[in-house]
Amino acid sequence: MELNFDSVKRNCTHTFSANEIRTFCDCSRKRYYASRDLLAVRATKATPALSIGTAVHKWLQVMYSKASNLLQERNSDFSIEQCEAAVDEIRATIDLDGFLSELDDDNKKIFMCITENYIGTIAEDLTKYTVLGCEVDFQLNDWPVVDAMYHGQIDMIVLDREEQSIKFFEHKTCKDFRPEIYNRFDIQLHIYDTYGRVYSQDMDLAWGGMILNEIKKGKTERGYAHHRMYYKYSFKEHDDFFRWLTRKTLMAIDSVHEPCNNYMTCKMCDYAPICLKYGYEVPATHEEIVDAFVDEETGEVMFKYDPRESDEED
């Protein structure tokens, strides 16, 4: 297959992400509400699970990138002692209040538990990996079909110094570790694998695959746990996924935005009040949604219009 990774975003009509095509597979109506190519409506309040995940991601980004940079500046031999010292030094400079400000009390406990227990893992990683970038935006232009573009953000790109290979980290905070069967078909991991093959080739290095870095959201050391899975799909799996994604992308482009009628999907959906009001009717504009739904307790609007900026690439 031909891939295009221009540094400048193409003017593709249809823009997708792993999350968006996953949403479409669950419920095409939900994708219609959320997609920035369509209604671009978001719930105004972030869920607690999203808030803690965002805070942990930001903390990991700061710790990994700053400690790795410090080690390189000092021409470190990357011994565990030097890596631990660098991590401790960076940790001492960080004001955690900036990460905690958006969290409720329970999630503050979870955040503190994670940062206390995961800190040693950062030092261990830095003995093997050099951090090349965190929160790295990418895009796949005219892929998997012409006039469609997939975009995303790699949590962390590292160089495995021993293997001389590129690896991508995907950090996940979770209540329970994901079953292996889910990861086998994970849309996000497959898309990252596609990008990783070309990224590593451009760097004239081997592609080492992806590291799914799962961190349990425990409030105490007893509830905390950490688990990793390594993924590098075969060429056959790579091609099979490409054909699957092509079919799903074409279906999404031609969708009539039907509701899913799935119990658990509807129960957990932020957009349930909209469907409850409109039924099978498809609202035509974001204005009628933003203006129509107000929280009875707070008096605040429940949804906001969140269009894509013209130069956005993430």
Residue ranges of predicted features:
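Terminal, charged accessory segments of proteins
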Residues: 1-26
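Nuclease catalytic cores
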Residues: 18-68, 108, 112, 135, ...
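A non-catalytic, helix-rich entry segment at domain boundaries
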Residues: 58-137
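Short, compositionally biased low-complexity segments
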Residues: 25-36, 72-96, 209-225
